[in-house]
């Protein structure tokens, strides 16, 4: 199955009316034209993909390897670089640009982003566990519960206090409401992971759309 995708930046959320008068929430994604930085093929790399670059970085903020990587594409160093796998390469070559017009209204996509970070949190906020009795005699309010008396170790993945958020998350099966080619903007129905100005990857959905 071939895939198409583009990199973007989350602008925020708004709402639009459909022709039937239905009000739907949408996320605005800035998809300033991406630059093709590298092409990978099955013969050379073992898989096929297109490496895209998004959001220019000033030369003074980039090092020599970053400048050399984009030299063949004749563009500025990029802040966000990502590969889209299983792409039908066709006539695509290094230095080409990919814009929002690769998608159309009604298409179904998967959006990947980095969730908001919330720092070190307890199990009530982080995992939704219940608190203990709040009476005066109780000494157990918001702490984690007992880990048990038999097993002498903690299993990996046990829900305990720790860092919350700042993880890569993919929201699947979102509908594109509008692809604004003039302003290089995609309107996606619903919400997507991450804070405003965070980077996103928009790809064709991997699941059956029936």
UniProtKB/Swiss-Prot annotation:
Top-level taxonomic group: Bacteria
Coiled-coil spans in chain: none
One annotated GO molecular function: structural constituent of ribosome
Family membership: Belongs to the universal ribosomal protein uL3 family.
GO BP term, example: translation
Annotated organism of origin: Pediococcus pentosaceus (strain ATCC 25745 / CCUG 21536 / LMG 10740 / 183-1w)
Keywords: Ribonucleoprotein, Ribosomal protein, RNA-binding, rRNA-binding
Protein name per its UniProtKB record: Large ribosomal subunit protein uL3
GO cellular component, one term: cytosolic large ribosomal subunit
Keyword match Transmembrane: no
Pfam families: Ribosomal_L3
Function, as annotated: One of the primary rRNA binding proteins, it binds directly near the 3'-end of the 23S rRNA, where it nucleates assembly of the 50S subunit.
Matches recorded under InterPro entries: Ribosomal_uL3, Ribosomal_uL3_bac/org-type, Transl_B-barrel_sf
Subunit field text: Part of the 50S ribosomal subunit. Forms a cluster with proteins L14 and L19.
Keyword Chloroplast among UniProt keywords: no
């Amino acid at each position: 199955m071939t895939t198409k995708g583009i990199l973007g930046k989350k602008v925020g959320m708004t709402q639009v009316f459909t022709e039937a008068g239905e009000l739907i929430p949408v996320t605005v994604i800035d998809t300033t034209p991406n630059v093709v930085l590298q092409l990978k093929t099955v013969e050379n790399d073992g898989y096929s993909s297109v490496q895209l670059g998004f959001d220019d970085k000033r030369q003074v903020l980039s090092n020599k390897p970053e400048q050399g990587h984009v030299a063949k594409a004749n563009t500025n160093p990029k802040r966000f670089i990502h590969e889209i796998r299983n792409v039908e390469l066709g006539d695509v070559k290094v230095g080409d640009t990919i814009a929002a017009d690769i998608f159309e209204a009604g298409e179904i996509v998967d959006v990947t982003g980095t969730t908001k970070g919330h720092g070190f949190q307890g199990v009530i906020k982080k995992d939704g566990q219940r608190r203990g009795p709040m009476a005066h005699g109780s000494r157990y309010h918001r702490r984690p519960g007992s880990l048990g008396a038999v097993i002498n170790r903690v299993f990996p993945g046990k829900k305990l206090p720790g860092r919350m958020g700042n993880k890569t998350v993919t929201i699947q099966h979102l509908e594109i409401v509008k692809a604004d080619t003039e302003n290089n903007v995609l309107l996606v129905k619903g919400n997507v992971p991450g804070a405003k100005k965070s980077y996103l990857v928009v790809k064709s959905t991997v699941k059956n759309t029936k």
